[in-house]
């Protein structure tokens, strides 16, 4: 066992213990909630072909009128919504699904413009597509 490495490791951990490191890490979620099935965000996939970027976002239980999509910058897309329960709370026996506000900012790998976004909500999936801004360089034989 290398006691010198252990001593250095302890020094490093003590530095973080004295700072606000763990407070900042746990700022948004308490340790006992790290593995909760409830989440106030959603998951998405990103695809590309030669001409378009495609984003598929899981939005179960979100109606179009409760959905907000906004381009914060050319590479940041804000998606907000509300997941509404199907039945009233007094009928609830067991609940595993999350209900309430959801929000996520998606970092886009390629720039987008608002007027080029095509958006459709279908069967609990939000489909977003926009054209790629790929530059083509002409080959000059004379060089």
Swiss-Prot record:
One of its GO terms (molecular function) is unfolded protein binding. Residues 34-143 form the sHSP domain. Induction: Induced late during sporulation by the sporulation-specific sigma factor sigma-K and negatively regulated by GerE. InterPro entries: A-crystallin/Hsp20_dom, HSP20-like_chaperone. The keyword Signal does not apply. One of its GO terms (biological process) is protein complex oligomerization. Keywords: Sporulation. Belongs to the small heat shock protein (HSP20) family. This is Spore coat protein P. It comes from Bacillus subtilis (strain 168). The lineage of its organism: Bacteria, Bacillati, Bacillota, Bacilli, Bacillales.
């Amino acid at each position: 066992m290398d006691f010198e490495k252990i001593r250095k490791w302890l020094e490093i951990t003590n530095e973080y213990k004295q700072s606000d490191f763990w407070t900042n890490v746990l700022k948004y979620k308490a340790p006992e909630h790290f593995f909760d099935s409830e989440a106030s965000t959603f998951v998405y996939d990103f695809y590309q072909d030669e001409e378009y970027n495609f984003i598929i976002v899981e939005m179960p239980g979100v109606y179009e009128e409760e959905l907000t999509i906004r381009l914060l910058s050319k590479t940041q897309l804000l998606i907000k919504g509300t997941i509404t329960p199907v039945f009233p709370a007094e009928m609830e026996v067991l609940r595993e699904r999350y209900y309430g506000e959801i929000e996520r900012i998606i970092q886009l790998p390629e720039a987008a413009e608002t007027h080029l976004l095509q958006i459709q909500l279908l069967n609990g999936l939000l489909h977003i597509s926009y054209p790629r801004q790929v530059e083509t360089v002409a080959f000059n034989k004379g060089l």
